[in-house]
Amino acid sequence: MVFLKRFRAYGFKSYADEITIDFTHSMTGIVGPNGSGKSNVVDALKWVLGERSMKHLRSKSGDDMIFFGSKDKPASKLAEIELTFDNSNRLLHDSRKEISVMRRVYRGSGQSEYFINSNPATLKEISGIFADIGLEKGSLGIISQGSVSWFVEAKPEERRKIFEDASGIGRYTKRKEEVVNQLNRTLINLKQVSVVLNELKKDLKKLTLQAEKAQQFIRVKNELKELELAVLVGEYLQAQTELDKFNFQINSSEHDFKIHEPQLELLEEQIVIFNSRFHSADMQSNELQKELQDIYQKINELEQRKVIIDVQLRQGFSQKDEKQKAAALKKLILVDQTQLDGFENQLSNSKTTITDLEKLINEQKSLVDQIKLQIEKNTADLIYQRSLKTIIELQTNELKKTNNANILVKNANALTGILNTLGTFLKFDKQYEKAILKALGKSIGYLVVNNNNAAIQAIDFLVKNEIGKVTFLPLDDVASDTKITNEHMEILKQLDGFLGVCSDHVKCDPLFQPVVNTLLAQVIIAKDLNSAINLSNYTYKLYRIVTLDGETVYAGGIINGGFEKTNLSDGYLSSASLDNEQNINKLENNERELKKELTELEVKLDEMNRKLKYEELLQAKFIERIVQIKKIILELKMEYEQLTNTTFDGKKAVASEAELIHSLNSAWAKRDEINSKLKLNQELKLQLAKTIKQSEEKIVDLRALLDEQRAKLVSAREGKIRFENTIQNITEKINSVYKMTMEFAIANHNKPVKLSSMQAHNKIAKLQNQLNEMGVINMESIAEISEKQKRFDDINAEYESAQQAVENLQKAITEIDEIASNEFDQLIQKLNQELPKTFKYLFGGGSCQIRYTDPSNVLVSGIDVFANPPGKNIANLMLLSGGEKTLVALSVLFSILKVSAFPLVILDEAESALDPANVERFANIIKTASKNTQFLIITHRQGTMMKCDMLLGAAMQTKGVTKTFAVELENAEKYVSENDSN
């Protein structure tokens, strides 16, 4: 049979170049001159199977295993041997049909690498596979001249190893060693457990006394807790009721303020308008008075002229009088012309003033319209912001019902290291809002804490109060070195649609930057979904990518998108609420400023309109006066012409008088009209004065009412603060002392107290004193006694289990000993049947027998070999010659191969001490045994070579470098002769 199929070597000793030897026959001879490296095959086999002794490997150090170099070949950096075995008959302890084992070592390292079928392995695994096949140290599977000497000279106990390999009980021996080791460990453990049990009994007795005291402490403390919590909850609810009353009073007063303050502002604005109107009416009265004076002046002039005409009519004019009259008329015409020029200049100025006023009025109206539009827009924005405020309050209230993180923040005074939800610390531009919120997801509501201890404490608080679960971000334990590789960043920067990394667009305090980096430093922002897909492909789908619209491409290529209702976090709502409140305040301030500006503009506009009306009245008066003067001048000119060109005409004088009377009638009518207007205007002024007085009285009343409401509001707010402090103190005490929320306390401890308030507080003080008098309490004793008892029970069970294990292991050892003893003894009996036959064949007679040194203890007994060559009676093997010693060892080996064949035997010049006749017997018996065993024989003897199926030659064509080649048998004599001559 062929067990070793292939031998491959590289860099091992003299094998500088890689060589491969395929074994196809069961009896192969390896021949060659001394020093050619043929025995390196044996060293290689030992080395692969784990031989560590440098002496047995014919070396001084591990580096001696590696080719040292020659004149033509450099030194190798490593040595490598690989052996391939046929395991189709399952001779090895492995199920694979072919087993390849390899060992490799590097120069200078001293560390070996082992492989089984190219897979990394350990020496222990290799040794386990090759157990009981005769290739281990001390076995007859590898025999050299040194092995023969060892076999003969070895102590009986050392020689036993050979027979154990042959019997196959090595596996039992190893199993027994394992069981014995396990038994020893179990016995040690049993002793240790016994010591622990005794200590636990003492501890249990001590803890029992401590636990009884602790339980009494707990009973008193629980009574104190129940009573104090009931009192605190009752006081809290009472304070809450009073607080609600004050809040109602505050809301009512503020509501009244909202009603009365606008009324006061309206009245004050109305007074301004009424005063403006009164001033306008007063100015109009002055203008009418002036106009009335002008009418009276005109009437006087007309009456004077009438007197003149009347005189003319009664007396007539003489020529002398006419000349004097003409001169007087001429002078009068010049005076009237001067007066006319003055009125025309005033008229021109009045027209200019009216034009300027109309322009200013139009500009003022435009400003008023703009202000009104701004007020309308501001009002619309204010309505929107107030609606948004309502929505935010509703969302905030809804979120607070389930936001456990908020509860922890609210109760931060009862805990340590609680900061706030992550969202409250982050700021980012509106452009990236959807992307960053999508990237953060639920983590925006995670609770930031200082360290792991704070998180653990908060979790205990949540569990105790049955609140729910919260995810924590401990600042001292987050990994902040996560980032996109530089290589990928360079690629991303060159691609369209890349807008950066999320963490770069978030602003926060440096304290929270590690948290931001952990969550966002590997999340990319893309312009749109197409860009995101492209970026993902270029980065091998290693990163998560979010778009500006909130779509996501996950690592691995999964895409998420579509409409999504925003899930606002508490932090985000708080920020939005703050912005909303600021916007409302700003808009309300704007509204007040705009209304104030509008009132001022309207007052100015009224003033301008009054000025315009006044100028228009003046203009009308100037026009009317100009017409009158022109008419007088015309009449005077006509009269002058009559005086200078004609004599006195009585008829014309009469006509002039009639015309004067008509003018007087018109003037008197105008006088009456102005007097009527003055009367109406006076009545208007009286009415306005009355209205102003009534409004001022109402303002006084409203201010008094507001002062009264303000005083009530101050009192209510003081009461509110007082009860808020009471509520806060109670809440803080319940949080800090009892580690529970107020809501939980109300839900579980709102119970009636049968004692009065004073009695309840006295009992609380008494219970507290009772607790203080108990001294030091080991509260953990209750839990410890339970744990100790459990541990005692567990260890006692372990002790009993160990006792049972000891019995089982002892039983297993007995069974292993029986099986191993039987199998070993059967081998010895079979050997004693075969050994005499083999011995007689090799020696040509004589006797040989194997005996126990201690027959009563087969498992540990040494093995003696008693050999008597023909004609000799030898008491000690050391007395045999070298050839006889070799034959004895070979007799035992070949007998073992007949009884329990080894799959592979290596003989390294084992027959060198034999004479030719014995060499021939040696070769014949190997040939017979090769049917069941593969032999590798390193030999110089021709008799051995002739029986081999195949010969492998080893030679050094280059000094220091071994080459191998197949040698035909007809050439074997040539090599042998050359070797013998050497």
UniProtKB/Swiss-Prot annotation:
For this entry, the protein name equals: Chromosome partition protein Smc
* GO terms, molecular function: ATP binding; ATP hydrolysis activity; DNA binding
What taxonomic ancestry is recorded? Bacteria, Bacillati, Mycoplasmatota, Mycoplasmoidales, Mycoplasmoidaceae
**What interactions and quaternary structure are annotated?**
Homodimer.
Kindly name one Pfam family recorded for this protein. Answer: SMC_N
Question: Which parts form a coiled-coil structure per UniProt?
Answer: 171-231, 280-310, 337-377, 575-718, 753-822
Query: Where is ATP bound in this sequence?
Result: P33, N34, G35, S36, G37, K38, S39, N40
List UniProt keywords, sorted A-Z: ATP-binding, Coiled coil, Cytoplasm, DNA-binding, Nucleotide-binding
Instruction: Return the domain comment text from this UniProt entry.
Output: Contains large globular domains required for ATP hydrolysis at each terminus and a third globular domain forming a flexible SMC hinge near the middle of the molecule. These domains are separated by coiled-coil structures.
Q: Which GO terms describe its biological process?
A: chromosome condensation; chromosome segregation; DNA replication; sister chromatid cohesion
Could you name the Gene Ontology cellular component terms for this entry? chromosome; cytoplasm
Q: Where in the cell is it found?
A: Cytoplasm
Q: Which family does it belong to?
A: Belongs to the SMC family.
User: Residues in domain SMC hinge?
Assistant: 416-535
> What does the UniProt function comment say about this protein?
Required for chromosome condensation and partitioning.
- Species of the source: Mycoplasma genitalium (strain ATCC 33530 / DSM 19775 / NCTC 10195 / G37)
**Residues annotated as transmembrane:** none
What domain of life does the native source organism fall in? Bacteria
